[in-house]
Every structure is written in C-alpha cells, then in structure tokens.
C-alpha cells in the first residue's frame, strides 16, 4: 500500500444536510484494542457523532465502532469517547471559534491515510429549516439543468 493512499471507511452524509461546513481539518484518532481491525472491516457509524473540547483536548463522542468479531476480551465499549490528535494551537483556535461564533465540530469522514486512521473534522454552522429548503431547491434545479443538457446532446 502506498504511503499516502486514502481509503474512506465512513462518511457522515447527514452532516452536509444539517450543517453548513465552514472549514475542514484532519485529525488522528487514539484507538485501543481491536478498534483498527473493526474499522478495516467497515463497521463504524458517524451518524450521531460530535466533537467537543475538554481540558484542552479534542474528544470525539458517540462514534460507534462495532466490536471486532474475533476480539473477545480486547474489545472495548463501542461508543466510548475517543481522543483526537491535533496540535494544541489548532485546538485552541477551534475552541475560540466554537465559543465565539456558535459553530460546532462535527466528524465528516473516517479514512485510512497509509496505515493510520484519520478523521476529517468540520467546523459547522447549523442550517435553519428555510436553508434546508433552499438547498433542496438548488439541488433540484441543478438536476433539471443537467437533465436538459443531457437530452440536448
């Protein structure tokens, strides 16, 4: 496997529907036991996951990693909080934006970069109902334009 090859294991598609993604960052994940093997099998879910900053550390909460089939006693709690690895100054900058601007930290995807597990964290702002309707209308209009162009040629 190449050193920087990227293999996406899970995407949080709901996040793009619920939030405007202002900025994206990459962070490493501190995993224990058989969690990496379980992620390689693709048994993880980001649906309800969110990130928070506690005691100067970035924590990933509610990410579900199913127990590894052959892991027996090495398996850990599937929804335990996991520490994300970023530079201290990056975490402090995120803390300032979250506190001041009312933004949220949401995990957007989990992927392998080489042999390391990485998480793409998004600095997001929540969408209101009218924003969601507008996004749906724009997506629908774009589809109709593409359909018309396809029929033309």
Model segments located where?
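C-terminal end-helix/capping segment
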Residues: 79, 86-91, 125-153
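Intrinsically disordered, low-complexity regulatory segments
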Residues: 1-5, 9, 137
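Ribosome large-subunit tunnel/peptidyl-transferase-proximal elements
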Residues: 6-103
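Beta-rich strand-turn-strand
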Residues: 85-122, 126-128
